[in-house]
Amino acid sequence: MNIHAYFQSFTLFAAALSSVAQNPTFPTGNPHSGEAFFKVDFPNVHGNGRSCATCHVPEEAFQLTPQHVEARYQALAQRRLTDPSADDPLFRSIDANDFADDFTNLRNHALVRVSITLPTDAAGQKLMWPVNDPTATVVAVWRSTPTVWNSAFTAPYQLDGRQPTLQAQALGALVAHSEITRDPKERFLDDVAAFQRAQFSSPAVENLSAALASGAPPPPTDPLLNIEEQRGKLLFNQHCATCHGGPTQTVPLTRLPPGIRNIRISKPVPPAGADLPFAPSPIAPRLWAFRVPGQAAPEVRSSTDPGQALLTGNIAHLNFFDIPTLYGISRTAPYFHDNSAATLEDVVRHYQVDAIFVRRVAPVGAPRPDLILDDEIPPLVAYLKKI
């Protein structure tokens, strides 16, 4: 398969995906049937052998890690020494760097290819496009596979928030990653969604979800905290709750577009003068052109992944991504949409450096984030590991 054939096959099912996304429902579904559907191949929809669990690995907190991918790659290589036809559905050409057998991004970073149709205005004119391919109607970016834990209260879904329901999310994955050639039955999607809604990072978070669903006051979710962790919670409320606010830790407390943020991850190099403590994005940057009202010439920006801008075409949404809940985060490394932070310490240090950068470039009078001090990092990380 080449890139043109890939984009053509993706476009064929865009209408079906759009129909589910635009008509969201929240039926009960059967989580027991959904578990079976989640974990096995889908024989009735003629896919490529992948199930949901191929990438959302139950034993790996329902996500995909570089270590897991590499172990499977090496195991497959060993099997092929005696059986050249041995197969693992994780390794499909759609997620190869060269659409053949180079799985560098998948093996080294657990990143999969995600295709998105470029946004257009009412007249059908594209609002943005890659500078090196102005005729493109669909583009691909490389992203991590997030956990399904706590998805009962984290809508919208996907790293850019493009799917309003778990049914739409499941169908999108079937189309893009399992390459189905037949539409699944609606009940199938309802059951898979029901199974996902039943997965939580802890019993306390499950109780929180039930309370939110019933309209009851949210119960406390913190386990017993020691003195360091208690200090970390205070620091969390000071530094992190601005975006990770509310009982679900997904409600921003600032006057910005709800649910999305630019945390300056979609850059291949650190901001000028910064020294990031973890590897920059493994993905090469591209130049993107944006149509801006009132301007004759397009604005051009560099990004490894434009995030929500790929949905809206709005340059103001460049590099914006959905705000995830942080419950269970100690078990879902690596972090960010490109898996560029290996540890929670790396994540916190990124925000430490990012705050310095924002304070330096913020216009006069604009709000400036508090700086995270070096001695605040251990207690903050200790609290994050406990929730």
Residue positions per predicted region:
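N-terminal secretory signal peptides that target proteins for export/translocation
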Residues: 1-5
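Periplasmic c-type cytochrome electron-transfer domains
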Residues: 21-387
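Bacterial N-terminal signal peptides
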Residues: 8-18
